């Protein structure tokens, strides 16, 4: 998921050279949404991983 966020961020940065219109604005929003979702999932799985392993 972070790979997609980085991809859209790079697209947004390249398109930003031409101004934040059209593709750049969309790519920026998609990159931001993917980053936030990935960060939330990271925190959730980090907290769930602290519960320990179930008994055998």
Swiss-Prot record:
It comes from the Bacteria. Pfam families: DUF1328. It is a multi-pass membrane protein. Its main location: membrane. InterPro entries: DUF1328 (IPR009760). Keywords: Cell membrane, Membrane, Transmembrane, Transmembrane helix. One of its GO terms (cellular component) is plasma membrane. It is found in: Cell membrane. The chain crosses the membrane at residues 1-21, 29-49. Belongs to the UPF0391 family. This is UPF0391 membrane protein Noc_0482. It comes from Nitrosococcus oceani (strain ATCC 19707 / BCRC 17464 / JCM 30415 / NCIMB 11848 / C-107).
